[in-house]
Amino acid sequence: MAINDQNLIWVDLEMTGLDPETHKIIEIASIVTDAQLNILAEGPVIAIHQPEEELAKMDNWCTNTHTNSGLVARVQESKYDEEAAIAETIAFLEQWVPKGVSPICGNSIGQDRRFLYKHMPRLEEYFHYRYVDVSTIKELARRWKPEVLDGFTKAGTHLALDDIRESIAELKYYRQHIFTI
C-alpha cells in the first residue's frame, strides 16, 4: 500500500432512479488502480439502508434489476447510512490517493457525481474536478470506429463492484484497440 498521486479512483453507485433530487444512493463501491489500470485495491462495497418509502420510488426497471441482483434485500438489511458509507469510503481512499488529486473514474461517471454532489458532498470533494469517463470513449468509438465495439461485452449485473471492474476492463480494451499511447 502506497499513496501515489498518479493512482486513479474508480467509483460506481447504484441508485433508486436517475434524478438526484428525488432518488437515493443504495450502493457504493470503489477501486484504486495505478496509472496503467492495474487494480491496487478494492474498497468497501456498501449497501446503504434506505426506508421503504424511498425504495417504493423505484421504477419497474430499478425494482426488477435491484431485486433480482439481491441488492434490495441487502439495502433493507443494511446498518449503513450515507454518513457511515462516506466515512468508510474516504478512509479507504486516503490509504491510496491524496485528496483532490485523482479524477473520478467510471462509466457515465457524471451521473454518479451528480448523486455524490447531492447526497455525499464530503466524498465528492475528495476527487479532482476532472473525470475519466469510459462511456465518452465508447460514444466516440460508436461514431468513429464502430467495429471496435463488437470486441467488448459487459455482463451488466448492475452491482457497483462488478460495474467498476467492467469499466476498468473496458478502458483497457479501448486503450489496446483505439489508442496507440
UniProtKB/Swiss-Prot annotation:
- Active-site residues are Y129
UniProt keywords (A-Z) are: Cytoplasm, Exonuclease, Hydrolase, Nuclease
Which E.C. number(s) belong to this protein?
3.1.15.-
According to the UniProt record, what class of enzyme is this? hydrolase
Compartments annotated for it: namely: Cytoplasm
Q: Which SMART domains match?
A: EXOIII
Q: What is its main location?
A: cytoplasm
Q: Does the keyword Phosphoprotein apply?
A: no
* Gene Ontology biological-process annotations: DNA metabolic process
Task: Give one GO term, molecular function aspect.
Answer: nucleic acid binding
The record's annotation in InterPro entries points to: Exonuclease_RNaseT/DNA_pol3, Oligoribonuclease, RNaseH-like_sf, RNaseH_sf
- Tell whether Transmembrane is among the UniProt keywords: no
Describe the location of the Exonuclease domain by residue ranges: 8-171
Q: Name one Pfam family in it.
A: RNase_T
User: What GO terms fall under cellular component here?
Assistant: cytoplasm
Which family does this protein fall into?
A: Belongs to the oligoribonuclease family.
Q: NCBIfam families, from UniProt? A: PRK05359.1
Concerning HAMAP family, the annotation shows:
Oligoribonuclease (MF_00045)
Q: What does this protein do?
A: 3'-to-5' exoribonuclease specific for small oligoribonucleotides.
Q: Which PANTHER family match?
A: OLIGORIBONUCLEASE, MITOCHONDRIAL
Q: What is this protein called?
A: Oligoribonuclease
- Tell me what organism the protein belongs to: Aliivibrio fischeri (strain ATCC 700601 / ES114) (Vibrio fischeri)
